[in-house]
Amino acid sequence: MKTLNRIAQVLLWLAMLGLSVWVGGTLYQMLVVVPMWSAAPPESVRAFFLGTKYNETIWNFFGPPFMVARLALLLGALLVGWHLPRHRKWLLVAAVCMAFGVVFTLAYVYPINDVLFAQAGGNHSPEEIQAMVRQWVMADRARFGVGVIGFLALLRALSIPIPMNGRS
């Protein structure tokens, strides 16, 4: 059990590091980047996404490989730490929240990204683009809220000592 507990502890720390970076990056995105393109759609959408390399660089931080890595570390901590009853419920909450975030992003947010980010609004009317911007911002805030709940649950799990003397 001692080795399993050490592995669980390492995975908890790595998962926390990954989610901490995500929380900070998402806050920056919400407070600094999103207002640049959502301020006055459709003009701001077209100016930002046609005039910057945002679509080329955003994948360096928020892309699917990083979603998978964050979730994999968390699921690894849950699986390896399943025998730790005091940690299990917090890890479950964190895993469910983050899994929801990934599924919601892929199923709901990315289709909007395709129109707003990749096509800079495309041939959609100004009203449609404005509506998509509002939907995206609300979805992003909801996704972040659920993610923060998961982050706090993981922080709680990390704050509970893991026994290293062989007991769970």
Region locations from a protein language model:
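Interfacial loop at the N-terminal end of multi-pass membrane proteins
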Residues: I7-L11, A15-A72, F117-V133
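C-terminal or internal capping secondary-structure element at the end of a domain, subdomain, or sheet
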Residues: R134-I162
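Interfacial segments of alpha-helical transmembrane regions
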Residues: T3-S20, L75-F100
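Structural signal for membrane-spanning alpha-helices in multi-pass inner-membrane proteins
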Residues: T26, A77-G81, T105, L154-P161
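Hydrophobic alpha-helical transmembrane segments of integral membrane proteins
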Residues: L92-F117
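Core segments of transmembrane alpha-helices
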Residues: F66-L78, V146-F151
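Short, charged juxtamembrane terminal tails flanking transmembrane helices
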Residues: K2, I160-S168
